[in-house]
Amino acid sequence: NREVPLSYNDIGEFSKKRCPFNHPCVMFKKTAVEKAGGYKETYHLFEDYYLWIRMLQTGCQAQNLPDVLLYMRTPNDMYKRRGGKEYATSMLRFHWWVYKSGWTSLLDFCTGALPHSLVCVAPTTIRKIIYKALH
């Protein structure tokens, strides 16, 4: 099970380096999404994370539940899809925006996005080990 922060403050801090929500179980008010500018495909493969950062920036109150709401299997190709030059480039562009938007510091960018980019270009077998350790 992927552990995510529960409180609003912890979610905000965690979101500076990693996505603070488990995607399939997210619920939100339509008005909160609209206030943040809606769903945009600006950062390929990071569309949801991009929306959630913008929602947090507009003051949207967020909370995770401690309960497991959904069990998911990891498809065999997931670790391959989370790597490569295109994924790394998109991830770096997204995290650079997070920094430029004022949500994070340059230190957060350097200690979050840069190591993540190394994981992206690592061989799939190494990436799988790292993802399993983090989740």
What name fits each language-model region?
Residues N1-K85:
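Conserved nucleotide-sugar donor-binding catalytic segment
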Residues Y50, Q57, A62-H135:
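C-terminal subregions of glycosyltransferases and related glycan-biosynthesis enzymes
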